[in-house]
């Protein structure tokens, strides 16, 4: 199909493109061409802005309100993509999963795969919310708005994420056995190359293992996920026990590519709740003098 307009009304498509440090404007690119009917999900905007860290998980209320305004409710199947293969879409997937929405999928290969398969592109702003079924917001009085009955209602699943305290406990063994896997490049992991964000120490969390996120993706422009067998091999070669019933915490620079590993582990057959993401990741850990580091 060339347009999501031809899909059942139960499906919503979301562009969750995000870029790090290369002066690209994801929303501008969305306006220049996106999957027809898609809405734009800004991970920096739909976030907890009370914290000094980037794109941290928003509150239930904020997520409910913003997702409802996109015309998405709890009955919808959400399909997420980004413009760079499989880079930031998994972060949006993980966010929906954090709020207990399980009918959420990532378009493998993203927008490049859509175009390669002959999919058409739509230019300009997304549809006005008022034209979308189940828009999710109704005006109560004056400037006050409230959730429509069919809007999105969030309920946080704490099993999907970890705080720095929980990571520290697992790193030292105080929180029980389990593993921590880092999605950054080996150079960053070993503090051989500087972090892209200023003010961060180099190195990695003690006892963590390095599995660069691109290793679970195919090479090339589409960057699709490898097969389940290949993904398992990548993790196992790094010393990761994919079949363990113990927690396997995914971390990275700021919680984006850690979600790539979390999704890859689900592709490999692991329950997502057993592969939580450390939301603050190295942006938080590497900025704190009171947290232990290896290689800095």
Give the role of each language-model region.
Residues 1-296:
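Cytosolic catalytic domains that perform sulfur/thiol-centered chemistry
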């Amino acid at each position: 199909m060339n347009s999501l307009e031809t899909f059942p009304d139960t499906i919503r498509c979301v562009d969750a493109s995000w870029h790090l440090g290369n002066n690209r404007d994801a929303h501008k690119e969305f306006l220049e061409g996106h999957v027809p009917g898609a809405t734009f999900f800004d991970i920096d905007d739909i976030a907890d802005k009370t914290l000094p860290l980037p794109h941290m998980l928003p509150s239930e209320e904020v997520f409910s309100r913003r997702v409802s305004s996109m015309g998405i409710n709890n009955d919808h199947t959400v399909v997420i993509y980004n413009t760079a293969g499989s880079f930031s879409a998994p972060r949006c997937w993980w966010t929906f999963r954090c709020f207990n929405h399980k009918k959420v999928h990532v378009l493998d290969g993203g927008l490049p795969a859509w175009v390669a398969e002959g999919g058409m592109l739509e230019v300009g702003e997304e549809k006005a919310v008022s034209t979308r079924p189940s828009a999710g917001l109704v005006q109560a009085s004056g400037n006050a708005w409230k959730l429509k009955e069919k809007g999105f209602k969030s309920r946080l699943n704490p099993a999907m994420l970890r705080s720095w305290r929980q990571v520290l406990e697992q790193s030292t063994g105080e929180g029980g056995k389990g593993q921590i896997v880092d999605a950054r490049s080996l150079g960053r992991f070993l503090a051989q190359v500087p972090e892209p964000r200023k003010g961060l120490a180099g190195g990695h969390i003690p006892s963590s293992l390095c599995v660069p996120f691109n290793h679970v993706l195919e090479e090339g422009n589409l960057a699709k996920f490898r097969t389940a067998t290949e993904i398992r091999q990548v993790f196992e070669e790094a010393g990761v026990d994919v079949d363990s019933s113990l927690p396997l915490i995914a971390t990275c620079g700021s919680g984006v590519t850690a979600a790539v590993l979390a999704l890859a582990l689900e592709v490999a057959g692991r329950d997502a709740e057993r592969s939580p993401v450390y939301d603050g990741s190295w942006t938080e850990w590497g900025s704190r003098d009171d947290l232990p580091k290896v290689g800095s």
